[in-house]
Amino acid sequence: ALHGGVSRREKFAWLYREVFHREITPEEMEDLCARFVTSALDNVLNAPLVPGIMDVLERWHGRVPLYVCSGTPQAELESVLERRGLARYFTGICGTPPAKAELLKGIVRKERIDPADAVMVGDAPTDSDAAEAAETLFYGRGAFFENASCPHGPDLLGLNAWLEELAAGKD
């Protein structure tokens, strides 16, 4: 997705500014966001999990702090993860606002770790940009990262092996 990881509020504001040549009103913003949630929630709740994610969560849960850092609004993100039975794997669930880079920097500060010891896993340019801004490592998932220099894969089936290599290098 070309604009993956950008908050819907930013997308709606851009649409009104660039296409309709005016600023979106607060009422229009709230209406569009509510309509978006209604139309998208069922799809999100019923979407298949990315291959490999459960193996990653089960292997690393309890060994290292795991966080979700997403452009999805906080309350909605928490609800989706709870309803999908995934929230229990995470030390923290961090949605917007603020932006991903600030969320990631905050996680690194909270955990009192060297950013070089943290890994951001993502599927959008905003994820790799956030990792770069926070100076963390990055693993890309999906077609966008096919030709990227970062470690990546079409899914998360190769993530555990890469993480194990990193962990072995830290011992």
Question: What spans do the regions from the language model cover?
Answer:
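Non-catalytic, surface-exposed connector residues within folded enzymatic/regulatory domains
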Residues: 26-30, 47, 71, 98, ...
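N-terminal polybasic phosphate/anion-binding patch
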Residues: 1-5
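Short, acidic loop-to-helix structural element flanking the phosphoryl-transfer center
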Residues: 38-68, 74-78, 101-102
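Asp-based, Mg2+/Mn2+-dependent phosphohydrolase catalytic module
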Residues: 74, 78-171
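Metal-dependent phosphoesterase signature
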Residues: 16-52
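Electropositive phosphate-/nucleotide-binding environments in soluble metabolic enzymes
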Residues: 6-9, 153
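An amphipathic alpha-helix signature
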Residues: 8-13, 33, 74, 78, ...
